[in-house]
């Protein structure tokens, strides 16, 4: 399994990560309350994961999923097939970009759904 970075965070990064962790805790309360089986998918950008803050958020999401035994499709780890024309801006995909993502995640999504009996 992939290990997480142990880089030293500055105060702003710590604050941002802590706020994200709090949102994950609140989300987990709802997941458990309503007996939801979540499937998380990591976010990518047109230039990969050069955004340090996005990297930190994804790292926390992966830890959260591992700790709670939730499924996650780590799109950031399984593809680098995108170019600038697949995005309207740094994060929002065009129709072509969305189709690429769908083709990439579909096999894993089907596998997860079969595992949970859907």
Task: Tell me what each language-model feature is.
Residues 1-63, 67, 75-84:
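Serine-dependent acyl-ester chemistry module
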Residues 70-71, 87-118:
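Histidine-centered active-site loop/cap adjacent to the catalytic His
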């Amino acid at each position: 399994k992939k290990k997480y970075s142990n880089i030293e965070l500055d105060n702003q990064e710590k604050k941002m990560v802590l706020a994200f962790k709090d949102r994950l805790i609140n989300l987990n309360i709802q997941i458990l309350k309503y007996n939801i089986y979540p499937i998380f998918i990591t976010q990518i950008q047109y230039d990969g994961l050069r955004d340090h803050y996005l990297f930190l958020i994804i790292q926390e999401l992966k830890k959260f999923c591992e700790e709670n035994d939730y499924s996650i499709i780590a799109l950031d780890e399984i593809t680098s097939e995108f170019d600038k024309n697949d995005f309207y801006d740094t994060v929002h995909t065009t129709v072509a970009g969305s189709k690429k993502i769908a083709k990439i995640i579909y096999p894993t999504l089907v596998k997860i759904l079969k595992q949970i009996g859907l």
